[in-house]
UniProtKB/Swiss-Prot annotation:
It comes from Mus musculus (Mouse). One of its GO terms (cellular component) is membrane. It is a multi-pass membrane protein. Expressed in neurons located in the gray matter. Highly expressed in thalamus, hypothalamus, amygdala and pons. Expressed in the CA3 area of hippocampus and in the Purkinje layer of the cerebellum (at protein level). Expressed in the eye. The lineage of its organism: Eukaryota, Metazoa, Chordata, Craniata, Vertebrata. Pfam families: Aa_trans (PF01490). Keywords: Amino-acid transport, Cell projection, Cytoplasm, Membrane, Transmembrane, Transmembrane helix, Transport. This is Solute carrier family 38 member 8. Electrogenic sodium-dependent amino acid transporter with a preference for L-glutamine, L-alanine, L-histidine, L-aspartate and L-arginine. May facilitate glutamine uptake in both excitatory and inhibitory neurons. The transport mechanism and stoichiometry remain to be elucidated. It is found in: Membrane; Cytoplasm, Cell cortex; Cell projection, Axon.
Amino acid sequence: MEGQPRGSRGPLEKPLPAATHPTLSSLGAVFILLKSALGAGLLNFPWAFYKAGGMLPTFLVALVSLVFLISGLVILGYAASVSGQTTYQGVVRELCGPAMGKLCEICFLTNLLMISVAFLRVIGDQLEKLCDSLLPDAPQPWYAAQNFTLPLISMLVIFPLSALREIALQKYTSILGTLAACYLALVITVQYYLWPQGLIRQPGPLLSPSPWTSVFSVFPTICFGFQCHEAAVSIYCSMWNQSLSHWTLVSVLSLLACCLVYTLTGVYGFLTFGPEVSADILMSYPGNDTAIIVARVLFAVSIVTVYPIVLFLGRSVMQDFWKKSYWATRGPPVLADPSGPWVRLPLTFLWVVVTLTMALFLPDLSEIISIIGGVSSFFIFIFPGLCLICAVDTEPMGPRVKCCLEAWGILSVLVGTFIFGQSTAVAMVELL
């Protein structure tokens, strides 16, 4: 199917989902997928190397996870083409039934809401630390407090970017955000070799043998870091070329590039600080280092560009709820279209206000990263596995191929269930 334009399909493919004027290029899809994955998890990756007991266990877990991460994206594209749906929750509802669709909507909305709050906290923390670096001996001015900077950025920058109707329009800001995340990885790599003044050299990161169960502690960070699967269906349905082989190539290129950025950050951050590495890698560096100050600014920019993608996905669930509401069925005509400005803009504003309020008044969210990573396993492993099991029943194929696909779907569900249970249990114990 390689090279087939949108609308042409192989003998085993169902009609492609009907998206409104899909114009997203392959390069644009790569950047949106890449930016969706290069989020706040980048700061935690060096710390994950330490928690897992060193580089070798982390590499092994990451390589195994990468196979499931790529297959999950491919499965979601295949499931979208089979079901004819254009949203993640729509695909699950169509293939797995209404009950599973409801569960997907609840998990989807909860997970994206938590991610949005975490992103806003990261933005606020980076801006606050930036002010401390620029004014080390002065009291914090009122305009540098998160209570002022976060609402200002949310209303002037985040809300306009999030109000866009289609996810394809995020490709421009995604390029900027991807470059900002790459700069962070580059700075951490270069700092290891240059050892600037003020950076204390730590002894080699040779750790004492850790229990084999410690390797599982890296799963939440991987799931939180590589979570671009929630956006996969929307991105796939926005592409002009929707052949499955082409989508596979886009998925592989995106995750390999993402893996490179995460690996450079994790390896060199861990080699630099060893067991003393901070959960926020930027906190381990001197606050007056110019390169680190620039990295803080650019990383905040990176998170600002990924927030609208998360909001777009959460808004799609709210728009599905709106379609079934009284106002959509019996209200004025302008309220019948959930993607129209009279519905889209208020829903966007509501999402920004709710997440902003939670970010300002809830305690530190760093401890619930494991919970977010655990819930993300639903969208990376469990739901794609269930969709594959259900989708093969609708396609004419040989018994051996069908058996292999069903076995892979079952394995994906089992792995996702284990990761969810393990990471959530550990997170709850740490919170208590």
